[in-house]
């Protein structure tokens, strides 16, 4: 009976140690993933376009490109960039 209790206690101790190691590994992976997301976010902000292209949503902070104009078009409920019938200069 003593060996059975000792075996159960030993097994619980082993499971506790393994569980602690798994949690530490999971937390490290979570932190690494968060850092990766922040790096990708920063990279996408630097690659932001200077103007909105055709059918893109437009507003004061993000105007349309030179050959487009910002207009309200039904049934779309926001302003979009549409062609102003000119061609961009190259």
From Swiss-Prot:
- What top-level branch of life does the organism fall under? Eukaryota
**Pfam families linked to this entry:** Toxin_12
| Positions of the propeptide segment | 20-50
Summed up, the tissue specificity of this protein is: Expressed by the venom gland.
Family membership, please give it. Answer: Belongs to the neurotoxin 10 (Hwtx-1) family. 13 (Hntx-13) subfamily.
Entry domain remark: The presence of a 'disulfide through disulfide knot' structurally defines this protein as a knottin.
The protein's UniProt keywords, in alphabetical order, are: Disulfide bond, Ion channel impairing toxin, Knottin, Secreted, Signal, Toxin
Q: Where in the cell is it found?
A: Secreted
Its name, as the record gives it, is U7-theraphotoxin-Hhn1e
- Quick one: a GO cellular component term? extracellular region
Q: Which SUPFAM superfamilies match?
A: omega toxin-like
Instruction: Give all cystine bridges in this chain.
Output: 51-65, 58-70, 64-81
- Listed InterPro entries: Huwentoxin-1
Q: What does this protein do?
A: Ion channel inhibitor.
Q: Which GO terms describe its molecular function?
A: ion channel inhibitor activity; toxin activity
Q: What is its main location?
A: secreted
Q: List the signal peptide residues.
A: 1-19
